[in-house]
Swiss-Prot record:
Chain segments carrying region Disordered: 1-24
Lineage: Bacteria, Pseudomonadati, Pseudomonadota, Alphaproteobacteria, Sphingomonadales
Family per record: Belongs to the class I-like SAM-binding methyltransferase superfamily. TrmB family.
GO cellular component terms, semicolon-separated: tRNA methyltransferase complex
Biological pathway: tRNA modification; N(7)-methylguanine-tRNA biosynthesis
EC numbers, comma separated: 2.1.1.33
Organism per entry: Sphingopyxis alaskensis (strain DSM 13593 / LMG 18877 / RB2256)
Catalytic activity, as annotated: guanosine(46) in tRNA + S-adenosyl-L-methionine = N(7)-methylguanosine(46) in tRNA + S-adenosyl-L-homocysteine
Keywords associated with the record: Methyltransferase, S-adenosyl-L-methionine, Transferase, tRNA processing
Protein name as it appears in the record: tRNA (guanine-N(7)-)-methyltransferase
Length: 237
């Protein structure tokens, strides 16, 4: 395993940045108070599909799900799979709960989603090795200043952890619209090519969003601002 530098995200027991923005709307606060306790990832002990959902099923893990659009859409596409999402920002958690709750009409509730309000790596450590089918890291905070590079989730420590938790043949997906983070990510992933196979045959494979990859609000915002967006898929060796 790679020796991790001091300050690597896996060595830090804290989160950077804000954890709350605008006050929650009444409906969102109600979901945080009532639905979140029902679908929250347990705060201790092993995190397995059987414990979360009552039986074994393919597991997906999203690191920092934002407003939950991608997680909810994937969960709707794959109702027999289980989805775990972690997000430190309570406003994002509240928005994800809206997606999970559905409207009891055209969009029924999603029973295959579990949410952790807090540090994704804390939960990831408690998942058994080789248990995950997919891990998603979509439009993470780029921390563009060089002195903050160690705060990026795309670093050696988190990648070793992701590699350990993915089953052989499992898939790691990464998306960004930030050129500095793009270069950083490719540099880091090159160091981990013994663990991951890059699933790209030509430039189009990372310049066009693949099928089965729902758009996030951050991606939509980036496109509206004229940014180029890049999509990466790696398979666990």
């Amino acid at each position: 395993m790679t020796a991790h530098k001091p300050g690597d995200p896996t060595t830090l027991n804290r989160l950077y940045g804000r954890s709350k923005g605008k006050p929650l709307r009444a409906g969102q606060q109600d979901l945080v108070d009532t639905l979140l306790p029902q679908i929250a990832v347990p705060l201790d002990g092993e995190v397995t599909a059987r414990r979360l959902f009552g039986f074994d099923r393919p597991l997906h893990f999203e690191i920092g799900f934002g407003g939950g659009e991608h997680m909810a859409a994937r969960a709707d596409m794959l109702p027999d799979h289980g989805f775990i999402g972690a997000e430190p920002f309570i406003n994002g958690v509240a928005q994800a709960l809206v997606h999970v709750a559905g409207d009891h009409g055209q969009h029924p509730p999603l029973g295959n989603v579990r949410i952790h309000h807090g540090d994704a790596l804390e939960v990831l450590r408690r998942i058994p090795d080789g248990a995950l089918a997919f891990v998603y890291l979509l439009h993470p905070d780029p921390w563009p200043k060089a002195r903050h590079a160690k705060r990026r989730m795309m670093n050696d420590g988190p990648l070793d952890l992701i590699a350990a938790k993915l089953k052989p043949g499992g898939e790691f997906r990464f998306g960004t619209d930030h050129p500095i983070y793009l270069r950083h990510a490719l540099m880091v992933m090159r160091r981990h090519r013994h663990q991951f196979e890059w699933l790209a045959k030509d430039a189009r494979d990372f310049q066009v969003r693949p099928g089965g990859w729902p758009e996030t609000r951050y991606e939509a915002k980036a496109r509206a601002q004229g940014h180029e967006v890049w999509y990466f898929r790696w398979r666990r060796r």
